[in-house]
């Protein structure tokens, strides 16, 4: 992936200028495409990858606690109800508490207000402001959204890998056992998206490059519109769920700060137009090695048990799945 430090620029700019100063002097390509923009400006980002990596290190964090996953991170950022549910599941007491965290606003779409704390949202929003005001060029997060931050690119990859291993992957495997087994969500790609007037205001119907997606609304309140609309999935092809795979219905989900939504990546969806204000969300895609996205369902006897789901296996942060 392009997000690992490359040889290009790794030694820093000539003349002893700091990496941060050199990165701020770059003129990045302006993101324009609202569809198929995965490789927009590819040469620029490849050429300056090492320099940008060093610049983010030099900038440093605003909220250091966001950058290291562990007990302190969990206490501050993971909702107490999820911590309790995860502890019970790991102890072999089953997933009753974990399932009780969710409701199903649309068939096949699961929502919860009890995954992350208000401190997580506020600290991450503050970090995004710190990153956005840094002057360091930032690559578009995916092929459709033009504005956001690739979290694995700015130093957050280790903490996010810990979060995925401990909680996000087990929850995805619990909710979608027919798609997520031991090798189907070993890697992740984490980014934020921002919707506002003058930027991206909506997102066309699409499927994600993931087997399962976590989408957390950071806020802050005050926007209008911008619901997430899901479409009944069926048919064939890489980016659709086979009929009979699982319940995957149609309907709208209205975001509010703190609402997390988990859905199959191939459950087609769109972001409806934002009518006012601004909204930021953090999104984590889960997928297999080499960007593989499973769509063929496992038979019941092939699915993981609850105990197997909550045995953490280390994941890897990767670049955009289309580059793997």
PLM feature spans:
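Surface-exposed loop/turn and secondary-structure junction residues enriched for glycine/proline
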Residues: 85, 147, 152-154, 163, ...
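Short, charged low-complexity intrinsically disordered segments located at boundaries
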Residues: 153-164, 198-205, 244, 312-317
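Polar low-complexity intrinsically disordered regions enriched in Ser/Thr and small residues
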Residues: 4, 11-19, 44, 146, ...
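Fe(II)/2-oxoglutarate
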Residues: 1-108, 306-324
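Catalytic core of non-heme Fe(II) oxygenases with the double-stranded beta-helix
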Residues: 173-307, 324
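Short intrinsically disordered, low-complexity coil segments enriched in acidic
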Residues: 1-9, 151-160, 254, 261
């Amino acid at each position: 992936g392009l997000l690992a430090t490359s040889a290009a620029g790794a030694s820093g700019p000539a003349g002893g200028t700091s990496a941060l100063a050199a990165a701020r002097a770059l003129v990045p390509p302006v993101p324009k495409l609202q569809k198929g923009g995965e490789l927009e400006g590819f040469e620029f980002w490849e050429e300056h990858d090492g320099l940008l990596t060093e610049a983010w290190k030099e900038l440093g964090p605003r909220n250091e606690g966001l950058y290291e996953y562990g007990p302190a991170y969990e206490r501050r950022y993971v909702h107490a109800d999820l911590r309790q549910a995860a502890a019970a599941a790991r102890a072999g007491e089953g997933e009753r508490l974990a399932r009780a965290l969710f409701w199903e606003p649309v068939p096949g779409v699961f929502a919860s207000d009890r995954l992350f704390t208000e401190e997580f949202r506020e600290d991450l929003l503050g970090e995004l402001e710190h990153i956005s005001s840094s002057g360091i060029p930032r690559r578009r997060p995916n092929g459709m959204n033009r504005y956001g931050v690739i979290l694995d690119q700015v130093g957050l990859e280790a903490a996010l890998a810990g979060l995925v291993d401990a909680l996000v992957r087990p929850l995805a495997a619990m909710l979608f056992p027919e798609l997520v087994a031991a090798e189907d969500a070993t890697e992740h790609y984490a980014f934020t998206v921002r919707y506002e007037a003058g930027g991206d205001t909506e997102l066309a119907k699409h499927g994600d490059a993931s087997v399962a997606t976590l989408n957390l609304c950071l806020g802050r309140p005050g926007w209008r519109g911008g619901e997430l609309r899901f479409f009944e999935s069926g048919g064939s092809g890489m980016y659709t769920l086979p009929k009979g795979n699982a319940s995957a219905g149609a309907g709208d989900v209205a975001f509010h700060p703190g609402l997390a939504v988990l859905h199959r990546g191939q459950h087609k969806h769109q972001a409806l137009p934002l009518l006012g204000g601004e909204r930021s969300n953090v999104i984590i895609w889960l997928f297999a090695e080499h960007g593989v996205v499973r769509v063929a369902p496992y038979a019941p006897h092939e699915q993981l048990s609850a105990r197997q789901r909550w045995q953490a296996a280390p994941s890897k942060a990767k670049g955009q799945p289309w580059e793997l």
